A protein has these predicted regions:
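Carbohydrate-active catalytic/glycan-binding domains of CAZyme proteins
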Residues: 1-127
C-alpha cells in the first residue's frame, strides 16, 4: 500500500514536533510557547491524516503563563510511551524550567508537572 502526502503534512503552526508510535497509532506534540491551553496533541493512524485530540497542559494549575512574553512559555516538548504510560518532557522558560507530565490515556487527564531541579537548559528529551 502506498500513500501520497503533500508537504507540509500539517499546514499551520506546529513548531518543534515530537512523535511517538504506540501500536498502530502515532502521537505528535509541539511547542505552543505562551499560548493557553498548551502543548497540542495530535493523533494519526497513517502519518498523513492528523486530528487534534487535546492539549497536554489544559489546566491553569499546570501552566502558569502570567509573566510569559511572546517568545517564552513552552519550548520543544518530547512525547514517549513506556509500559502503559505516556510521558511528556518540556521546558517552561517563563516559569520553573524543565518538567515531566504523565498520563495513561493520551486524551488525558495529564498529571500536574513535576519540575526537575538542577536540570537546566531547554529542549529536553527522553530515551
Amino acid at each position: 500500500m502506498s500513500i501520497y502526502a503533500k508537504n507540509p503534512i500539517m499546514p499551520g503552526f506546529y513548531p518543534d514536533p515530537s512523535i511517538c508510535a504506540v501500536g498502530d497509532d502515532y502521537y505528535l506534540i509541539n511547542s505552543t510557547f505562551a499560548y493557553f491551553p498548551g502543548l497540542s496533541l495530535m493523533h494519526s493512524k497513517d502519518l498523513v491524516h492528523w486530528e487534534q485530540i487535546g492539549n497536554v497542559m489544559d489546566r491553569n494549575s499546570q501552566l502558569p503563563l502570567m509573566k510569559a512574553g511572546h517568545s517564552q512559555g513552552l519550548f520543544a516538548p518530547t512525547i514517549r510511551y513506556h509500559e502503559g504510560v505516556f510521558y511528556v518532557i518540556c521546558t517552561n522558560v517563563s516559569h520553573g524550567g524543565n518538567y515531566i507530565v504523565t498520563a495513561t490515556n493520551p486524551e488525558g487527564p495529564w498529571s500536574e508537572p513535576y519540575y526537575l531541579e538542577g536540570a537546566d537548559g531547554i529542549d529536553p528529551s527522553l530515551f
